[in-house]
Amino acid sequence: MTNETLQTIRSRRSCRAYEPRQITDAELDAVLEAGTYAASAMGRQSAKIVVVQDAATRAQLTRMNAAVMGTDSDPMYGAPTILVVLADAHANCAVQDGSLVMGNLMLAAASLGLGSCWINRAREEFDSAEGKALLKKWGIEGDWIGVGHCILGYPATAPKPAAPRKPDYIVRV
């Protein structure tokens, strides 16, 4: 059985090479809206999405993330847009709620022909003094957990086909 949604799920791949041009506002808005419709525990919508497209903030996040990773390379792979997903630290299912947002963002991006990738280390970034200062600068108050970065852009290369699924992925009892 298949439909457009299932086909997008099957074909989405992490993109690690991007064209330098910025995505359109319409594409960004569509991806963001999809993120806001992610399931959340008790419908509380505990996540928050921060859009980063300016060069200075993008460079700061890249530097912070690379430091946590212990590398000099660009962990954001040159993507022109970074969506930082945060979750309310006091919510019962904060990380799960934020993770569902990340999934919706990436699937929506794929449905529009955009590349995306989940970049880790957001928790370490926003646990740091520099990360907390960024949140304050952005007007975000309270206790927040960095769930992930969803990087977005136009893929520089076509995605490779999916690897076969492992035979023991599903266990029916």
Region spans (language model):
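Acidic, surface-exposed loops and disordered segments
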Residues: 1-173
